[in-house]
């Protein structure tokens, strides 16, 4: 047949062995292929339906023969998302409470969230800035005030149909369309349900075809690792928006716990962001060539970048380490006593707190002393009730000692909470991040304050609020819509002056401040244990947790880790720490490879530095996460 076709994208796929025959210099005999083997000559690039963190679907053509890590990098490059190593692909979780539906029903549900337009192909067109890189000479691609694109749209979406109409659709927040759509979504009811969701993470070291992903299958693109490097409004409008969306949905679907005051603060920020997103879209339709004051943009960038670089203009004596000393109420709940909090004169030096019965006795021997290195620090705050508690779980040989500290006011709480958080990481108050940590805590508390003059809230804006789309179902059951609306509008007064990007960054910061933030749960059985427990993995530690309450039983820091390995035959993960501490567990609901990849992935992310201008070291990632390279 005289048919002209480009076969360059095709390759041989061996279905029986689940492998691609990509080494064209190898003979079939070297691959071990016999005469009865069935080989499929198929395109390597196939369509995939990706659900983005904002819950919208977009069709993408992805290389099914690339390892997932490389495929995700290509997808992020197309979407202009820097640091693709933080994201990965996840299979859609099934709601166990619902009966099995027909595929057609699922498709109809998904179509309600379909983005208009485009098929986006990784690699098509020029990419404006190379994701995964950091460079001081990078040209800003977004307005640091509202996140709108500064570049010609074709520069970062190529010839894609996304460059028509609204080019910044991926950088624009999508409000929840209706309470009904929110109600249909799967909400994990317990910690075990949250742990089961993590069964769905794909293996980053194997290709999509090897993991039986089909063409046109729906997968979720999510931030997998909760370590967000160099979030910068000038380059990361899409990344920041998708991160905001992921955090927003985590709160609305109750995947992470928050207090009532925090929920109203999150709702107020959402309301503010939704309003500004509409205004920003309208402004840029009318004024697409708006000039940006580079000095203002740089100052704003310094103000609200989550990580890095702020140094105090007042330099104290660099040889001295700051200390805290004040009366603090201390409580040990595990002691068999009816006594409550007892006031002590407490001094915080280095990473230790010493408690004295009075200020006058502070030169003598302390009544209690605790080293906070490696401890778990959890806030317990109620602004309206003036409750400012710090819960400490301090590691000891037999488990964790629980200590509660009660502060008198916000200022005292912020200073001591910041010191506790740094001490848990082995840092002192001399660390440059201490002042910023104190300010972040105070800012977080300030956003939760009730407005003393609710009558100042204009009546006319009450009508454009839909509380059913701004708070989680738990609070909808607890209060009437009118009550929730009033509280959201009160909380909105604390954030009303923020710019669009600042509001998103504040939302992400507040999400990061929640006690449960950044912990990925897995169901596990520990060596010597008789029942199923939870293993929690965070960016800097492993946590053994009670499966019913979520309380930490024991914590181990990665900074003390010597090595970890997997016995692939019995599916056991073993982690060795300093002082001959050895932790072994079997994952009961998930392949141990997923847990191994989380540990190795966080170690890989901890090696990143701002002065690196080279691209990602893929081979290093595979060495740390694949287990067999």
Question: Where are the predicted features?
Answer:
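N-terminal recruitment modules of adaptor/scaffold proteins
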Residues: 2, 20, 25, 53-55, ...
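Conserved, structured regulatory domains from eukaryotic proteins
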Residues: 21, 43-48, 98-122, 180-208, ...
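Short aromatic-glycine-enriched beta-strand elements
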Residues: 386-391, 571-574
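Short amphipathic, charge-patterned alpha-helical segments
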Residues: 1-4, 64-84, 161, 167, ...
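Short, contiguous acidic and Ser/Thr-rich linear segments
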Residues: 1, 52-70, 239, 405-410
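Canonical phosphoinositide-binding patch of PH/PH-like domains
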Residues: 60-61, 397-415, 580-600
